[in-house]
């Protein structure tokens, strides 16, 4: 389905940016933008779906929660035409673009949902491994961190998950992103990587989604390795329930929590 161009509210500029292999859009306030931080939003879609208008709505929410920070949303390349490492390469190019504009790593907050949440963690691992500045924080909503689909919740929530449950034909099991690469490669499935040196992370997940263990296991592993992590499991919630925006109590609470997390990062307080 082709969506019409997203028209931002009157208070915003939405600027298109052409990169070598993909495009990005920068959402910024027309008046008095906050340049203390910037949010790099990596969209979900199972590494097979392009950016959708919903993510520009997300960008507006992130702008509000961050007290007016700019939000950069890349439309990174996706499978099957562009399998791994295309998405990671484009996420890295987006991050480097922000560095070239004068932002320090600690001023950049990575935010992503589903595949985008996993991609945010993979990007952070790559940055650390290549001695580049890591971001100041990560917000991950229902992150997909285990493309082997081997976690406990893939079985326990199989009949509960309204989006991915009761079938082996979903993109969880039928996904072209890894290509010929090992699905346990940490840059594909961050769960199997090392989280040492990561910034603080906020991880939100629904209790009935098959990807529950992706979040729980990452949070436990990262904490063991000295990372500050806030894991919030929302009872009865489904995959990326934050797409309900402010229309249901749980989503409203999750967005408020994301705003509080950003405030914590800005004041450099304890999680």
Regions found by a protein language model. Name each.
Residues 1-2:
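N-terminal targeting or regulatory segments adjacent to alpha/beta-hydrolase or S9 domains
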Residues 6-271:
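Alpha/beta-hydrolase superfamily serine-hydrolase fold, recognizing
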